Amino acid sequence: MPKESLRNLDGFKIFHYKTIDSTQKEIWRRFKNKTIKDKTMIIADIQTAGIGTHGRIWHTDEENNIAFSVYFDFSKKNCRVDELDGLTVRIAKKIVSIFKEMYDIDLDIKFPNDIYCNGKKLGGILTESKVQNGLVRCVVIGIGINTNQVEFA
């Protein structure tokens, strides 16, 4: 079982796992079981089968990566699918600005979801949603950043 954070981050419910197959998969399991609430965040030290784009696996080692997924409930927002256009790129731009502001590191974006540093892939963003009758029911945003990863599959 995960450790549940004792404090919330602006209303986020945070669950931390030492090891998990995938933070994204855990969000979807909770969604399927109807045990998830808006602004639920799943964080893991180690992912054994993290999800990348195009069915790729996103590997994470302990203390060498940042891996988390966040669930947003849109069921009461009447949000059309087209309103999510560009969401992944906006998230990527925000990550780039955070790294610049906090660490004075210049990062690049490889459209639409990859983050690069000095020509090497540093991380990525996976945005998934459930849509019903043209309206977004929920959005799950997964972010993986390699901070000190040495070995890659």
Locations of the language-model features?
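N-terminal lobe of the biotin/lipoate ligase/transferase fold
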Residues: M1-E101
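Structural motif
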Residues: K13, K39-M41, I66, D108, ...
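Short, glycine/acidic-enriched loop or turn micro-motifs at the edges of active sites
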Residues: D21, T48, C117, I145-T147
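Short beta-strand segments
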Residues: I43-D45, S69, K110, L126-E128, ...
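Short glycine- and Lys/Arg-enriched binding-loop motifs that mark or flank ligand-binding interfaces
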Residues: I46-I51, I115, C138-V140
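Short coil/turn motifs at secondary-structure junctions
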Residues: D73-S75, K130-Q132, N148-V150
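Acidic (Asp/Glu) carboxylate-rich active-site/surface patches
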Residues: A92-G134, G144
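Short, acidic (Asp/Glu-rich) active-site segment that either coordinates a divalent metal cofactor
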Residues: G134-A153
